[in-house]
């Protein structure tokens, strides 16, 4: 009897974990129109710059690779803010990846932290928020322009490029919805 009860409980538990939300939003849900205006005035230029930077780097290896461990982010309908938060927090995990050029990592972190700031959100892990503190006090003269890292291809870089593309698409979707 006990074993049957035990098995029935633990069959439901994984289902509950799958059905539960990935992360509860830690955003101070602000006025969406204000968020759009802040994005357009403050952040959109940096997002465009980051997309242009990512286009400069080789991506032929990214097109042919299937990423076993990569996270795919979608901009969920009616949950754009939570989607943007999740993407921004995920992008911060690439900040210390040495295989990606320093200037590209810093720009990605700047966009991620800017997104979190505009949305008034926080990441679940405080380590990622420390990156934003580091980025906000960063001296831009310190960045490198490494041609050698442009030639290298690695999974982390491909994942970051996909994340950047998703982030931009989600911001565009958010803008269109709010403009209606």
Predicted regions and their residues:
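Cleavable N-terminal signal peptides of Sec/SRP-targeted secreted and luminal proteins
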Residues: 6-24
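Extracellular/luminal segments of secreted precursors and ectodomains of membrane proteins
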Residues: 26-180
């Amino acid at each position: 009897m006990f074993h049957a009860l035990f098995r029935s409980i633990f069959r439901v538990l994984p289902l509950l974990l799958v059905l539960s939300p990935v992360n509860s939003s830690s955003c101070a849900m602000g006025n969406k129109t204000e968020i759009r205006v802040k994005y357009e005035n403050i952040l959109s230029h940096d997002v465009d710059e980051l997309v242009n930077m990512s286009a400069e780097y080789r991506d032929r290896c990214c097109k042919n690779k299937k990423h076993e461990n990569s996270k795919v982010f979608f901009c969920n309908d009616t949950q754009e803010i939570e989607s943007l938060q999740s993407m921004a927090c995920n992008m911060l995990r690439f900040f210390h990846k040495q295989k990606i050029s320093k200037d590209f990592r810093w720009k990605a972190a700047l966009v991620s932290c800017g997104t979190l700031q505009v949305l008034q959100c926080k990441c679940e892990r405080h380590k990622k928020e420390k990156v934003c503190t580091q980025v906000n006090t960063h001296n831009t003269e310190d960045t490198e322009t490494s041609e050698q890292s442009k030639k290298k291809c690695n999974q982390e870089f491909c994942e970051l490029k996909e994340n950047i593309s998703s982030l931009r698409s989600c911001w565009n979707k958010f803008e269109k919805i709010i403009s209606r």
